[in-house]
Amino acid sequence: MQHKIIHLHQTASTNDYLRALPSPQDDSMTVVYADWQTAGRGQGSNKWESEAGKNLLFSILVCPTSIDITRQFVLSMAGALAVKAALDKYTDGISLKWPTDIYWHDRKISGTLIETSVKGRTLARCIYGIGLNVNQREFHSDAPNPVSLYNIIGVETPTEQLLDEIVQHFDHYYSLAVGGHSDHIVSQYHAALYRREGLHLYEDTSTGEQFSARIDHVSVDGRLHLALSDGTRREYTLKEVRFVLD
């Protein structure tokens, strides 16, 4: 898969930058990364804390026209697996926290904001906005559990090298997704899920109720299916439930 990589010293948001570009006319990806984002964001109204030049702040634009809108979360799975595969080269303990966060043990090293546009029953465009803590040593926001690759391994990692590795893995997993091999992606995603085994504490964000459950599976539309300790089952979409962290 051909890809074009654009480097910016500063931009408001790499997602915004790609959103303004026309869709590629062929089967290719466009990647833009910035040393600094003035308006980088995470899910909802969350802001992404990043020291200038220390981390990877990048977005990927693809046109997955073969993906039905009911199965679009497969693309989220593919993107998460690409980041995990790159990080696995440097450390163990990497897992995927539903829906799109990357964790090292109980600490967040990466997050993804995904934006899609639809044409009929299929996706026209998909933009992955990814923040990955690479060489930042200290964090000062009120985020509860950030960690960087430097915090884990004790040495700095060239950000462009890590980006190239992520793009290579993304090419692999994205090709599986659009090529009709999503079962392979789904099985790998489930095997890598954070808190995949055993009962853990969750909170229903609409009621405030806390309950113990284990992850049963994540469906291709992105719903988290939980099996509760009392034998009942529930399913949640984004922001309807949160993991209660120690």
Language-model features: locations:
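N-terminal lobe of the biotin/lipoate ligase/transferase fold
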Residues: 1-89
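Generic structural signal for residues in well-ordered beta-strands
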Residues: 4-5, 94-96
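Long, positively charged amphipathic alpha-helical accessory segments at protein N-termini or as interdomain linkers
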Residues: 65-70, 74-94, 104-246
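A generic fold-level signal
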Residues: 26-27, 53, 97, 122, ...
